[in-house]
Design a protein with these regions (language model features):
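Carbohydrate-active catalytic/glycan-binding domains of CAZyme proteins
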Residues: 1-559
């Protein structure tokens, strides 16, 4: 057997729901406002994973137009029963303030690659809904419950509601609170299992930050308030292990191997610190977002699940004895020459699918039609992919003929509508077509070059842009021939593109950093930009003293 190195899914892959069907494991992850909805991977060994088509790929299944940043798909729950896959997902429409307006849906498929059935509306009681298939044939939705009343705690326990197996509609008269969590509060992310005569409830607590944790409770019945919390040590948390390489573990799901070994897939993060910062306060900046880790589980003498190595988990985990080798790429590097009429599955758009309104792809180029700015949450032409390594380069060739400063096209590093950076071609009154770098930081926009924007020489048709992400900082380069690149003298703080930074000023945000291509024409003339030869080249997660890169990791963080 081989060791599994965490995280098993690098970059923004939060809230894992893991299952096994025969000899194949599947993980579904949250995607929030990014389209298509729900990210799926498969493996036969838990170590190497391959990306599958996303199930929510049409507006029939998911319409997020107008959704706020970090709204959308929260904590999808994948299950297998009755010869088909079942997927429950939450579409959150309101994130700020007292209310969490949302709708939970159910879709099914015989094949994990689809087609998926039209969605069935379940309810809007709370988020993080999952489906439990009892061994007597009955089915239940278990979910967090939201209370908007300012004189109550908004997290109102875990509600269980029976699903009519004929109509696939919920029966609200059966709803009851089965668990209220512990004093840590903020109980959410429930998954229910029946094992050895007990119902085991796995639930997250403590919020989505460094205090995050997973608790386990169990009961002989599904009656109201019948679940007893696991005694002694909490199941999984890094709140008291600040030195650990893997942080923020908690929300996740349980799975068994064919040979009867047990594993737990969890969200996690790998924060880093700026020079001089303590790893204790602040705990760090997680620019890759919340990723997916896996930990091995054993059962104690009292029948409670425990994490091998203690509740903080480990970076390196013993793989299953019955693992079947899964071939996958050595990293997540991507080269896209845009020859296909459909976008590569690594690309994502915001809230809505890629359509002719945004542009076209194929025949060796991507054409984007300029729409709103990158601060727009309704109409914008942007495709982006996750940062999945601490050190990488990304480059693209661009053709664009702006005639106004309101028109921009280029390469962006993006977190959400209030936090992004952009190197782009535009126009100004001094030099005509120029290169500028702009940043939106907590909603405040800054032009870095201003009147010193770099003039594009007359007769130059194409400009190449490259971003060099170096864990704590990143920068941009340009070229007029695709061979010789010149660095733009602006060094940017990567922490600005992290959940942790955004949380200092706003409510919960959950998505991690992306690198992407965008065209803007907020003047409304639909100016088009052409993109060629995109390359995302991962270098590694660690920089050695000799300047070399590697994927090496340890059980403890770099100090």
């Amino acid at each position: 057997m081989s060791l599994i190195q965490n995280p098993i899914l690098r970059g923004f892959n939060a809230d894992p729901s893991i299952i096994r069907v025969e000899d194949t494991y599947y993980i579904a992850n949250s995607t929030f406002e990014w389209f298509p909805g729900v990210r799926l991977h498969e493996s036969k060994e838990l170590k190497n994973w391959n990306l599958l088509p996303s199930p929510l790929s049409t507006t029939t299944l998911l319409d997020m137009k107008g959704n706020p940043s970090s709204g959308g798909i929260w904590a999808p729950a994948l299950s297998w029963a009755d010869g088909q896959f079942w997927l429950v997902y939450t579409d959150v429409k309101v994130t700020e303030g007292a209310f969490k307006d949302m709708t939970n849906y159910l879709t099914t498929a015989k094949d994990i690659r689809g087609p998926w059935s039209d969605p069935i509306k379940l309810n809007g009681v709370g988020f993080d809904a999952s489906l439990f298939h009892d061994d007597d044939g009955r089915k239940y939705i278990v979910q967090q419950t939201w209370d908007h009343r300012e004189y109550h705690h908004p997290f109102d326990g875990i509600t269980l509601t029976e699903l009519d197996t004929n109509t696939l509609k919920l029966m609200p008269e059966t709803a009851r609170t089965i668990y209220r969590g512990t004093a840590v509060a903020l109980v959410e992310g429930p998954h229910l299992y029946k094992l050895n005569g007990y119902y085991y409830l796995f639930a997250a607590q403590g919020g989505t930050v460094f205090t995050h944790q997973e608790v386990v409770a169990r009961s002989k019945t599904l009656e109201a308030d019948s679940f007893e919390t696991e005694p002694g040590d909490v199941f999984l948390t890094n709140v008291d292990t600040p030195d650990s390489y893997i942080q923020k573990q908690g929300h996740g799901a349980l799975v068994s191997t064919p040979e009867g070994e047990w594993y737990y897939a969890s969200l996690c993060a790998r924060p880093w610190n700026r020079p001089g910062e303590s790893i204790y306060d602040p705990r760090g900046w997680s620019t890759l977002g919340r990723e997916t880790s896996i930990q091995k589980v054993y059962w104690d003498d009292e029948g409670w699940p425990r994490i091998e190595g203690g509740h903080g988990g480990k970076t390196f985990v013993e793989g299953p004895k019955d693992a079947i080798f899964t071939e996958s790429a050595s990293d997540n590097s991507q080269q896209d020459d845009f020859t296909s009429p459909a976008l590569d599955p690594n690309w994502n758009t915001l809230r809505v699918p890629f359509t002719a309104k945004m542009g076209t792809t194929g025949n060796g180029k991507l054409t984007l039609i300029g729409q709103g700015s990158l601060a727009n949450t309704h109409d914008l032409s942007l495709i982006a992919r996750r940062w999945q390594a601490f050190y990488f380069d990304a480059a693209v060739k661009v053709k664009f003929e702006p005639f106004s400063y309101q028109q921009m096209a280029g390469l962006t590093n993006y977190y959400n509508d209030r936090h992004w950076n952009f190197v782009f071609l535009t126009w100004n009154e001094i030099n005509g077509k120029v290169i500028e770098v702009g940043e939106n930081n907590r909603g405040k926009y800054t032009s870095y070059l201003k009147d010193n924007a770099i003039k594009v020489p007359d007769g130059v048709e194409y400009v190449w842009f490259r971003t060099k992400v170096r864990k704590q900082t990143y920068s941009y380069e340009y070229s007029f021939d695709g061979v010789t690149f010149t660095e733009i003298p602006v060094q940017l703080d990567a922490a600005v593109l992290s959940d942790d930074y955004v949380l200092q000023s706003y409510g919960g945000f959950f998505t991690g950093a992306f690198v992407g291509l965008a065209a803007v024409d907020y003047a409304g003339y639909g100016t088009q930009a052409e993109f060629y030869q995109f390359e995302y080249q991962e270098l590694g997660d660690r920089l050695a003293a000799d300047g070399s890169y590697s994927w090496e990791a340890g059980e403890t963080r770099d100090k």
